[in-house]
Amino acid sequence: MAVRKTKPTSPGRRFQEFGTFEEITKKKPEKSLIKVVKKSGGRNANGRVTCRHRGGGSRRQLRIVDFKRNKTGIPAKVAAIEYDPNRGARLALLHYVDGEKRYIIAPVNLTVGDMVESGPEADIKPGNALPLNNIPLGTQIHNIELKVGKGGQVVRGAGTFAQLVAKEGKYAQVRLPSGEVRLVLLKCMATIGQVGNVEHENLALGKAGRKRWLGRRPSVRGVAMNPVDHPMGGGEGRSSGGRHPCSPWGMPTKGYKTRKNKTTDKFIVRKRNKR
């Protein structure tokens, strides 16, 4: 996908950038693979905000994506590359030879007419899904399972890829996009290639309204709030907040480690890169 810049006819258009969508071959989604999901606005079942700065946005239908790739041994033809409003990556519509249709995340260099397959005997080419045990070292992979049969959970964003760096015992060592090297069971499935739409991270939204179309509400600084709303709020005139930066609940930010999941620490060979 190339990046298209707009003419500066207004302040909002001056720095705005769009994708060209030349890889999209089908405009309307497959009816059998969509469903309507009610928006939560960042609230949980109790009605409390658990994820701030969410709400509004354009109406959208959820595409049912096959992250498990459990239809093994049956080849499928790529019928279309489609836009998905729920993610940065594109979707590939697969038509299996037995008549079933499924969506998968479209990797780089996957085009209409290509044949893809999943299973231990599949070839090493973009779009094919295999157990890590059957993938050569150094291969770029995405949509990686962390638990056997649960479906891909990591490396699914636009332009991302992981790399298989080692195999030892019943585990494989996978280098994730963050730089973290993690142990994953060799029986877990992964898809070959890099996730498509690589230029997605380079797009400039250009104006606040476009952020609202995506369902993202404004983020307000703590020092601009009142003391009742934030630990750094209040003060006469502008202030520094009077303490180290923190969240609205007093948790330190700016590099403070919050990871508490000690049960999975043993699977991390190397921690992620510092920002």
From Swiss-Prot:
Region (Disordered) location: 222-275
InterPro entries from the UniProt entry: NA-bd_OB-fold, Rib_uL2_dom2, Ribosomal_uL2, Ribosomal_uL2_bac/org-type, Ribosomal_uL2_C, Ribosomal_uL2_CS, Ribosomal_uL2_dom3, Ribosomal_uL2_RNA-bd_dom
SUPFAM superfamilies named in the record: Nucleic acid-binding proteins, Translation proteins SH3-like domain
Superkingdom in the source lineage: Bacteria
Keywords assigned: Ribonucleoprotein, Ribosomal protein, RNA-binding, rRNA-binding
Keyword RNA-binding: yes
Quaternary data: Part of the 50S ribosomal subunit. Forms a bridge to the 30S subunit in the 70S ribosome.
Family to which the UniProt record says this protein belongs: Belongs to the universal ribosomal protein uL2 family.
Protein name listed in UniProt: Large ribosomal subunit protein uL2
